[in-house]
Amino acid sequence: MKILVSDEIEKVCPSFVGAHVEVSVRNTPYSEGLWNEINRLEQLFRATLTTETLKDISGISATRRVYRACGKDPSRYRPAAEALIRRMLQGKELYQISTLVDLVNLASIKFGYSIGGFDAEKFEGDTLTLGIGKAGEPYEGIGRGLINIEGLPVYRDSRGGVGTPTSDNERTKINLNTTHLLVLINGYDGNEESVRANAEFLIRLACDFCEGHDASYYIYR
């Protein structure tokens, strides 16, 4: 899959760096080992963060800045990494969906980047373009119904929007039959070293908990 970054994104975030990750996998409903890792990280967050200081995490802070630059209120449409960590800090259970979805969430909260996790076989066309949502653009968020993506960074395939930092799209979501995982890591803070580390961590999780193989990633701008 080819990834293009539009001029409108370059204008609001010239330092943007992303990682495209692909892995062949076998999904399962639940992994105890993975949830042990998630629970350990949750304990660390509760000991070191508050719902205010989590906004200072580099990836979260940068994504919030881009939302504002695009005209979106980041407190109303929270980046997914922030929303997940905030949920932990409020003492709420993190959503348990499936092993693939859960490991993408773990990779996101560990590094603070909003990450899109997709079933690669559900895309239309061979190119994803990162742009900004338009007024009235149709978009069905996973478990959210139709959402207003005007002013949100959005990846589009040849049919339309598939992923934003707030919510991915129902059309390309992961399910238990997913065998070809595609992940997009969004480094709005421009920290290539951290984005690479996030990609490598995610691949490790996929190999450890979803029989991952034929894994690869590349950096894009």
Residue ranges and their predicted role:
Residues 1-221:
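Charge-biased, low-complexity intrinsically disordered regions
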